[in-house]
Amino acid sequence: MEIVPVGEESLGVRSMCLYVETRDLRILLDAGVSLAPRRFGLPPHPLELQRAREVREQILRLAAYADVVTISHYHRDHFTVPYPSQYMATDSETYKAVYGEKTVLAKSPHDLNWSQRRRHYGLAKALDGVATVVYADGGEWRFGTTVVRASGPLWHGPAGSKTGRVIAFAVSDGEETLAFIPDVEGPVEEEAVHFAEEVKPTVVVVGGPPTYLGWDLASAVSNLKRIVDLRPRLLVLAHHLLRDVQWREKVGEVLQYAERRGVEVATYAKLAGREEQLLEARRRELYGETGRGEEAGEEEE
């Protein structure tokens, strides 16, 4: 199994896009990229805009090879929108290049919050006749010796979160099993851990806690330790966690726990052999400003 990191906060953008290739299948997980419209009261820096364009180019290049594309949920950093956007590096035709003639394994709209349901409607209308959309919640598919499995609905953060629900995916080729668990924000709820326990992963990619919002990390740390106890060879911490320049200190207990148990912890940047580029987290520095405080609350992405 080949795992290629495409876009994520350690690579300078909001995303969790991964490309995975097995003997039988080429799958592009969550082919989206976006930038925070405001952070520290500032718009995206030109370096962030450049990185968004670069990541979008890589998404398009890999989409040309992919058989399957996933949509874990309808936040704009996890799918390609069907309209032009500078912050998502799209024009009016980009979505066709990503999804056209593909099988799209997508989150069902039946239990979405209002904003995700609205985005789903716009995308579903655009993809009619363009792609084969399969609502994936709880499903399983076999491609030769490769099995793709989707979780049931998981909370995007704490139970009852206003940001809605997501689904996770597992890809297994008989030798490796990748668990791709986006935007569970920790995981803060045990349901995401249960999915990992069920699929017995050798590699786990998980959306970590949004430490920059000042949340209580006790549940996230506990659940990350439970994932470590599954003894994957690799744990990739990603996304919301990497919006904090002090993320290593915030989850230091997990890093030490993983080291004692022989589980390697990495970021997308490390997997890509690149230096971390926490551009959003360093936006004030990029603009040469230090006086602006952190925003409160969680935005809808």
Curated annotation (Swiss-Prot):
InterPro entries: Metallo-B-lactamas, RibonucZ/Hydroxyglut_hydro, UPF0173_UPF0282_UlaG_hydrolase, UPF0282_hydrls. Gene3D superfamilies: Ribonuclease Z/Hydroxyacylglutathione hydrolase-like. Belongs to the UPF0282 family. This is UPF0282 protein Pcal_1546. It comes from Pyrobaculum calidifontis (strain DSM 21063 / JCM 11548 / VA1).
